């Protein structure tokens, strides 16, 4: 009978003194972790699709202001690159992941660096700092940085579910 002991996880709530702890058996834990994994994968996929289309929609304003075509071309390539990275690359490939090959890290840094350089060059052409800051180039630079931050947080939310999966059946 000792070998048939249930493995349980106890969840407590420190806000209520009268609160009874919730016990989950193996099947409930498996179902709970699988539900978290599915929800996390669905949310990450949804964010990837939304951000990819957002980047492609932001290409339209680039054609509305008359400036250097070389800058526009680099900004277009940067937005296409962000959309590609967000939609096609797995979350494990990122700037902050030590397992990422150096060629991808170089491309991430190059994309951010080139858009930042073009942003600074665009700022130097304007007399008003306020107008220069609200320029579309600043938005493109911000988007490239936001891409890496979003992918970093999406990757770590996936890791959190995996860590929870490893902690199942712990005895309290």
Swiss-Prot record:
It is a multi-pass membrane protein. Its main location: endoplasmic reticulum. The chain crosses the membrane at residues 46-66, 76-96, 104-124, 129-149. The keyword Membrane applies. One of its GO terms (cellular component) is endoplasmic reticulum. Keywords: Endoplasmic reticulum, Membrane, Transmembrane, Transmembrane helix. It is found in: Endoplasmic reticulum membrane. This is Uncharacterized membrane protein C660.17c. It comes from Schizosaccharomyces pombe (strain 972 / ATCC 24843). The lineage of its organism: Eukaryota, Fungi, Dikarya, Ascomycota, Taphrinomycotina.
């Amino acid at each position: 009978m000792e070998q048939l002991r249930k493995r349980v996880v106890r969840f407590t709530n420190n806000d209520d003194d009268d609160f009874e702890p919730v016990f989950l058996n193996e099947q409930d834990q498996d179902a709970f972790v699988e539900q978290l994994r599915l929800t996390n994968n669905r949310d990450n996929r949804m964010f990837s699709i939304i951000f990819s289309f957002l980047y492609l929609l932001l290409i339209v304003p680039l054609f509305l202001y008359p400036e250097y075509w070389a800058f526009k071309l680099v900004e277009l390539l940067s937005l296409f690159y962000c959309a590609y990275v967000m939609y096609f690359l797995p979350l494990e490939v990122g700037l902050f992941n030590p397992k990422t090959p150096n060629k991808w890290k170089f491309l991430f840094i190059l994309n951010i660096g080139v858009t930042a350089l073009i942003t600074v060059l665009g700022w130097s052409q304007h007399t008003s700092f306020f107008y220069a800051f609200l320029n579309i180039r600043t938005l493109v630079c911000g988007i490239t940085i936001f891409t890496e931050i979003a992918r970093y947080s999406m990757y770590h939310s996936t890791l959190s579910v995996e860590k929870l999966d490893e902690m199942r059946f712990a005895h309290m």
